C-alpha cells in the first residue's frame, strides 16, 4: 500500500480482542478468538516476512478487550489470559515475543467493562501498571466507548450531548493515564447514531442522500486533552496540599471532585488539565515548582452554550483559580 498509494502504516495489530468471549457470537462483533500460542506463532511469521521484505512497520501483539485479561484471567482461561506475562516474560518460552524483530515492548488494550464501580476504575489500572512495570512494557489504550454497564450515565443507549457523558469519559482518560500509565488514548469512533459511541451525532434522511451532524460536549472534552497535549509529551508529577499545607495522598484524584494531571510537550510548553466532577464550583491555588513559567492561559469546556475549549482568561503562578461545577479546564503556558 505504501508503494501503490503512498500510505504508510507505522503500526499493525493482527488480533482484535482475542480474549473477548462476548465477541464470538453473532455477526456484529470483530473478535478474533486466537490463543496466546496462536498469536505468538502468527506474529513470529509476520515478523519474519517484514524483515525479509525490509518493512519497518511495528507489530502490536493484540488488543485486549478487558484489562483484567492482560495481567490475569477474566471470563476466559489461561490460554487467552496473562497476556503481558505470556508475551514478555522470557520464562514463557512458547509465547515470548520480547526479542522478536518489529515487535515493540508495548501492550494495547480496551478500557471497556472496567470503569464501574469506582474502585475498579482505580484498582484494576493499578494492577495493570504493576504488571507492565514488572516486565518493562509500555501501554496504549486503543478503544473504548460507553457500554451497558456504565450505569452512572444510563449505559450506552441514547445519545448524550451534555457534560454528563463528557465528564464520565474524562474521568476514564484521567485514570488510564495517571494509574495505568497509558501513553496513547483513543476513542472508538468519530461519528455515530443514537448511541454513546460517536463524538459527533449524525442524522441521515431515509434515502441516505442527505442529513446533518451535531457536535457534543464529549468531543470538546477530549479536546481539553488532545488539542494541547502533543505527541512526545511527558507527564509531570502533581503534589496536592490542603489548607494547612499537608500533602494529600493521591490528591490529584477525587473521583467525584477534582482530578488533575500535568504534561510537558517537546517544545517546552506545559499543560495542566483539571476536571471538576462535582456539582459545585471548586477553587485551588496553582504553584509551578521552578517558578520559571509565569502565565497560563485557560480554556474551558462546560454545559454552557459556546463554552467549547473557550479561552476564559489567564492566571499567574500562586493565583487562585475557580473551576465551575461540572466543567473541564486546560491551562497552557504562554
Predicted feature locations:
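Conserved beta-strand positions
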Residues: 14-17, 61-62, 109, 141, ...
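Aromatic/acidic polysaccharide-binding cleft in carbohydrate-active enzymes
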Residues: 138-249
Amino acid at each position: 500500500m505504501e508503494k501503490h498509494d503512498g500510505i504508510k502504516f507505522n503500526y499493525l495489530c493482527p488480533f482484535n480482542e482475542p480474549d473477548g468471549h462476548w465477541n464470538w457470537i453473532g455477526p456484529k462483533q470483530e473478535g478474533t478468538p486466537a490463543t496466546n500460542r496462536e498469536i505468538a506463532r502468527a506474529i513470529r511469521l509476520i515478523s519474519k516476512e517484514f524483515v525479509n521484505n525490509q518493512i519497518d512497520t511495528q507489530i502490536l501483539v493484540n488488543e485486549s478487550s478487558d484489562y483484567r485479561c492482560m495481567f490475569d484471567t477474566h471470563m476466559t482461561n489461561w490460554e487467552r489470559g496473562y497476556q503481558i506475562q505470556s508475551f514478555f516474560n522470557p520464562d514463557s518460552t512458547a509465547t515470548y515475543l520480547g526479542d522478536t524483530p518489529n515487535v515493540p515492548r508495548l501492550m494495547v488494550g480496551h478500557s471497556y467493562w472496567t470503569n464501574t464501580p469506582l474502585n475498579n476504575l482505580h484498582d484494576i489500572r493499578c494492577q495493570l501498571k504493576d504488571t507492565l512495570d514488572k516486565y518493562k512494557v509500555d501501554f496504549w489504550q486503543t478503544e473504548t466507548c460507553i457500554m451497558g454497564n456504565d450505569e452512572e450515565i444510563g449505559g450506552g443507549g441514547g445519545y448524550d450531548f451534555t457534560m454528563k457523558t463528557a465528564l464520565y469519559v474524562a474521568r476514564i482518560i484521567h485514570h488510564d493515564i495517571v494509574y495505568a500509565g497509558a501513553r496513547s488514548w483513543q476513542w472508538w469512533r468519530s461519528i455515530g447514531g443514537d448511541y454513546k459511541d460517536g463524538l459527533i451525532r449524525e442524522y441521515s434522511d431515509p434515502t441516505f442522500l442527505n442529513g446533518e451532524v451535531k457536535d457534543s460536549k464529549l468531543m470538546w472534552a477530549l479536546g481539553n486533552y488532545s488539542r494541547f497535549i502533543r505527541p512526545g509529551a511527558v507527564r509531570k508529577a502533581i503534589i496536592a496540599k490542603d489548607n494547612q499545607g499537608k500533602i494529600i495522598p493521591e490528591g490529584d484524584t477525587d473521583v467525584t471532585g477534582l482530578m488533575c494531571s500535568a504534561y510537558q510537550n517537546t517544545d517546552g510548553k506545559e499543560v495542566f488539565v483539571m476536571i471538576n466532577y462535582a456539582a459545585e464550583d471548586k477553587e485551588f491555588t496553582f504553584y509551578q515548582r521552578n517558578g520559571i513559567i509565569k502565565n497560563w492561559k485557560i480554556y474551558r469546556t462546560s454545559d454552557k452554550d459556546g463554552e467549547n475549549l473557550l479561552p476564559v482568561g489567564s492566571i499567574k503562578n500562586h493565583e487562585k483559580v475557580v473551576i465551575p461545577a461540572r466543567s473541564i479546564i486546560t491551562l497552557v503556558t504562554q
